[in-house]
Amino acid sequence: VLARSCIAALFNERAKKKKFERKYPNMKKLLSLLLALALVFSLAACSSKTDDTTTDDTQGDANAESVDLVVFAAASMTETLTQIAEMYKEVAPNVNITYNFDSSGKLFTQISEGADCDLFISAAPKQMNAMDGSLIDDKDKNPDGLDLIVTDSRIDLLENKVTLAVPEGNPKSIESFDQLAELLKNGDVMLAIGNSDVPVGQYTEKIFAYYGLDEAALADSLTYGNNVKEVTTQVSEASADCGIIYATDAYSAGLTVVDSATTEMCGQVIYPAAVLKGEKEEAAQAFLDYLQTADAMSVFESVGFTAL
């Protein structure tokens, strides 16, 4: 009896199912379609969430707060720092670097008078010393008692060389500083040099002292430039027979170097760098750190700088 009841119930359910399918012939396909659509929407939602997260991360990098960084640097660094700024965009795309290239003396004057500057790179320690608060008690190095730089950030970044460069063809057949000294004494040469308030001019004064030359007495044989770029241009244009410039500027201008000054003649040519006190110390320090990387140093060294 129980078996007959179960069999009857089974046939009854099958009959109901067939009746339902005859009444709604497309219902099975509809249910399959709805199930498929539900699966598609579920996958799309997961994908959208992942994409949103990725997009947010990407936009977070791209939309990082923009920083305008002002860098004052010696004119002799124009080519190298311009190239490095392009490289730095790959590392910090939100940082916009504005350079002010000139003689270190002029840059120091501008900074001491309140010019907006976040990072200073000088062609000599003299200008950096004059704004270093750690030297405030040394009136010879910091005569105005300025305290403008973040002392812990100060480094000796690079070393350069002072050279004797000649224009194309070397019309005076100049070969050395020794020969130049004799030509100057005889008034047989026109020499381009930097003004006394710029580092390259100050190194030249030391060279004159080394050879016992009186600059005032050589007035008719000297022509001056406000920075090393101006001196370099005078040599390139052959408006002077030779010029005392940095090795890096001679390289960048394609000039022939006939001699290099020794440390006994003018001392070391050190380029110190430091972050200035202000609102952008962190960004300035980050860029200064980048200048010490292998990538940046390879650019400096390619034109004749030596890493320190």
Residue ranges and their predicted role:
Residues 108, 114-144, 150-156:
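Short beta-strand-centered segments that line the small-molecule binding cleft or hinge
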Residues 48-51, 56-86, 90-91, 105, ...:
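Exported/periplasmic ABC-transporter solute-binding proteins
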Residues 22-35:
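Positively charged n-region of N-terminal signal peptides that target proteins for export
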Residues 42-45:
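C-terminal motif of bacterial Sec signal peptides marking the signal peptidase cleavage site
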